[in-house]
Amino acid sequence: MSTWLLPENIADVLPSEARKIEELRRRLLDRFRSYGYEMVMPPLLEYLESLLTSGGNELRLRTFKLVDQVSGRTLGLRADMTPQVARIDAHLLNRQGVTRLCYAGPVLHTRPRGLHASREQLQIGAEIYGHAGLEADQEIQQLMLDALHLTGLKKIRLDLCHAGVLAALFARDAAAAERGEALYEALAGKDVPRLNELTDDLGADTRAALRALPRLYGDASVLDDARRLLPALPEITRALDDLAHLAAQVKDAEVAIDLADLRGYAYHSGAMFAAYVDGVPNAVAHGGRYDHVGQAYGRARPATGFSLDLREIARISPVEARGAAILAPWKQDDALRAAVGALRDAGEVVIQALPGHDHVLDEFACDRALVERDGAWVIEPR
């Protein structure tokens, strides 16, 4: 085997892509800060049981595991940063009021989520803790849409779902709850034959409701169909009311209701959402409410948030990757060094052409040059 080969679905990030990713990362973190979100940096590696307190079997299967050579305990390489941020809020910060946190860092998956997906993602996201009202859900959804617009993406569609619908059906029907994982997988995959098979022996009301969920997709008027087709349980009525309210608040994206879009259902407890753009089959960002995640760390708090993969966003974003730069000569000249230093302090990119390498670098758009005129160094267009 060649020593330069990387594992499947793992890739190096080359300069032009890395520059674009970093530009987007800075834009998003600056925007998060403008909303009042504080950044945290959880470790890449934790004890396995700490990483898997929520998320169900799906998260367990996605998590790399290894043995700690110091303690002998099993460690995990994080596959999702959300549980880690919940741990920080519940156990380390221990604040009583509203806490807004954001993060950015790599996550690793044992298997890719799509045919060409990377197993190493750069996850960035934001979370609100401490407020159970829909105001927090609305702010998080607005921040997610704001962030996606900052990356240059257009024609965004926001799909809304609610974990409370399925939870209410399971709470009423123990037989359905016992096969909850299989039902979740069938619903999430829109696998109608499998769904029909799993619901054949359930009660008539539960069977009809579960089989209706994949059909409850479309604009906000779908909620009227849902009220007609689903049992009039208080939890379901409240969930549909929440979705109607959230859908009405979205002004800068198309809104769709998809009551079978249950990505991450295992740890969500309320409104769930995912953002899609034309030409990309999978969601480019997703999130939702997960009020019970902190319970495993000793303190359950109302929480909602979202995350996205910056590497995937960079791949589809129209943001220009080549940065403007100033080309300067290489000379032993104190005045030149001072001019270059002043420009760099002002935030300019200044590339000094090393002797024998006077060509313009393809990675940068050197649209200006630092030249000597009458004993002074000045900038001129190239």
Swiss-Prot record:
GO terms for molecular function: histidine-tRNA ligase activity. It comes from the Bacteria. One of its GO terms (cellular component) is cytoplasm. Pathway: Amino-acid biosynthesis; L-histidine biosynthesis; L-histidine from 5-phospho-alpha-D-ribose 1-diphosphate: step 1/9. Keywords: Amino-acid biosynthesis, Cytoplasm, Histidine biosynthesis. Gene3D superfamilies: Bira Bifunctional Protein, Domain 2 (3.30.930.10). It is found in: Cytoplasm. InterPro entries: aa-tRNA-synth_II/BPL/LPL, HisRS-like_core, HisRS/HisZ, HisZ. Pfam families: tRNA-synt_His (PF13393). Transmembrane segments: none annotated. The keyword Amino-acid biosynthesis applies. One of its GO terms (biological process) is histidyl-tRNA aminoacylation. The keyword Transmembrane does not apply. Required for the first step of histidine biosynthesis. May allow the feedback regulation of ATP phosphoribosyltransferase activity by histidine. HAMAP family: HisZ. Heteromultimer composed of HisG and HisZ subunits. This function is generally fulfilled by the C-terminal part of HisG, which is missing in some bacteria such as this one. Belongs to the class-II aminoacyl-tRNA synthetase family. HisZ subfamily. This is ATP phosphoribosyltransferase regulatory subunit. The gene is hisZ.
